[in-house]
Amino acid sequence: MTPSPATTEIGNRVRWVIILALLYCACLVTLGPTVQFSQWYIGPDNNQAAAEAEAWLDGRLTLPGRGGDTALYNGQVYNIFPPLLTVICFVYYGATSWLNDGMPLVFFTPLYVLIVAAPIPLLAYYAFRRSGADTHWAAVLAFYAIAGTCLWPVAGMLGGNAAMVGDNRAAWIYSIQHILAQTGLAIILIDLLGRRRMWLAGLGLLIATWSRQTCFLYCLPILWIAWNQPQRRRALILAAIPVAITIALPGGLNWAKFGNPLETGYRHIFDVDNPNRRIVLGADGDVHLFGLGHVPGHAKEMFLVPPQVFTTHQGLRITGWGPRTALWYGSPLFLFTLIDARRWWRDSVRRVLMLATIPVIFVGLMWHGPIEGSSGYYRYTLDYSLIWMAAITPWTTGPTRRWIVLACLAWSVFYFYSISGNP
């Protein structure tokens, strides 16, 4: 007897729920002991964005004091990071203050984890479904994107590893930025590889850019794809509106703080009393945050430098020779972006997405160094790793390739588990 369409639909939904539940369980079981979500804590005392949210509630932009990377400009202290986390904290603190005046401005940990980290498995799963993976394989690739990349140790900086590097890392804003950006990048992929509503890709761009500024370069494939839609004018309008909003809020904040919409204030971290000022000082005595001279060294670290493998009384251990290690060693799956280059090049959407990662990578390579928080990995690879995985997804599903991908996954999980104790 052939089941009715309604019965088949119910069965598919039940299977989908079970697969997602297993994906979340796998992430919790694998990452939980080192990431320790229950220890995630954020408040104005340990995070610049949370302190700025408190300042917004008081009707000001200035912070009460310097903590972490903050800008000292005209005798005032400002947050210099993109605004997404500030907006999230501002909404939460405003709501809790309205409901219970006098309540401490501390994010309720389960809700904090739910907003920052919980969307990633679901959205990554949908991104790989749109990329061409079947129901089960999309869950495998989503697990790889979380446990088989440096997203694992980066998230660990907020929980288990925080105690190893000082309490100031318990809400290390750089880690939170990378994690939030994954949500935005996944939404971009879901839309551009799916129905191409364009406004949804624009929303993903906003989330990613308000977390990591370099992700704004993904507006290029969004606008290019909108230009090539059958209803070009409508698609461009739907894409341009969120792109404009993405620019407007950070630009307005920059203008209000520093008098220039293009001035993020990062250079003002390095005032004369900052011991790291020498890192960014040029021959002219001025602060230079970007430079072509940084490219060779950073490129070597991102793509060539091997990890250090050694044994202790606890067994095999892996770490970096220096602060960074090339992405191929921890995530060998990315080698397929080179092996399958001709294949993804023939797909116009995948091609333009992959091409957009080139300026994203290059801007990161031009950034001054050293790159903190990257022992055994290079955290800037998170700005494009999800794009690369989506680009090669259709060619990971063959009988031979599946076993190769599973072997890569096993190695990657072992690798990032091994370095998870290294801040």
Give short role names for the model-derived ranges:
Residues 1-423:
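Membrane-proximal envelope and lipid/glycan-remodeling enzymes
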